[in-house]
């Protein structure tokens, strides 16, 4: 069974834990209890493949930012979550993305941009803005509601598909013999 290490990142209060718990337990948590770090595992079938999702739900609070490098190092794919009623959380996405790219030492990291709380009547982040940001990053954008479950599976499953594509790309690039050699000739001594 293939395992996928997913990491849910974003500012405090955007609904990272609510999204994760909705996926894992089919239940909406409406009280806010800031997360330090929680890990969940769930077996699912995505596109006919049985997968084990290893999901790390992270702290959004700034005081836990020192822990970020560690989980960013081990994660394979990232759900970058903002709340559609919180412009600051949307602006913060770029900070998370840049930190992920720095820690992974790569511009090509599987990610999905997630606009949560789409069940709310008022929004400060326009869908068009979010689509444009995702397009500029070259990643998918999905609106979700942890409360109604709208888009929850779609967000996590899309991330798994992004990781699959990334793995295939890495596999194909290593077939040309240049992997690890930076295109130079290698010799075993």
Swiss-Prot record:
A lipid is attached at residue 181 (S-palmitoyl cysteine). The lineage of its organism: Eukaryota, Metazoa, Chordata, Craniata, Vertebrata. A motif (Effector region) lies at residues 32-40. GO terms for biological process: Ras protein signal transduction. One of its GO terms (molecular function) is G protein activity. Residues 166-185 are annotated as: Hypervariable region. This is GTPase NRas. Its main location: membrane. GTP binds at residues 10-18, 29-30, 57-61, 116-119. Residues 187-189 form a propeptide.
């Amino acid at each position: 069974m293939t395992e996928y290490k997913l990491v849910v990142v974003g500012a405090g209060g955007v609904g990272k834990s609510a999204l994760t718990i909705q996926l894992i337990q089919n239940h909406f948590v409406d009280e806010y209890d800031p997360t330090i770090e929680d890990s969940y595992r769930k077996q699912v079938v995505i596109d006919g493949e049985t997968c084990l999702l290893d999901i790390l739900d992270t702290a959004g609070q700034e005081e836990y930012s020192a822990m970020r490098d560690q989980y960013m190092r081990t994660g394979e794919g990232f759900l970058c979550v903002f709340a559609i009623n919180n412009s600051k959380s949307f602006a913060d996405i770029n900070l998370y993305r840049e930190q992920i790219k720095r820690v992974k030492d790569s511009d090509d990291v599987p990610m999905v941009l997630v606009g949560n709380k789409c069940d709310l009547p008022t929004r400060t982040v326009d869908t068009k803005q979010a689509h444009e940001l995702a397009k500029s990053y070259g990643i998918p954008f999905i609106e979700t509601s942890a409360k109604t479950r709208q888009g929850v599976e779609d967000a996590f499953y899309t991330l798994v598909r992004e990781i699959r594509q990334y793995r295939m790309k890495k596999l194909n690039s290593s077939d040309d013999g240049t992997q690890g050699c930076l295109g130079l000739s290698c010799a075993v001594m």
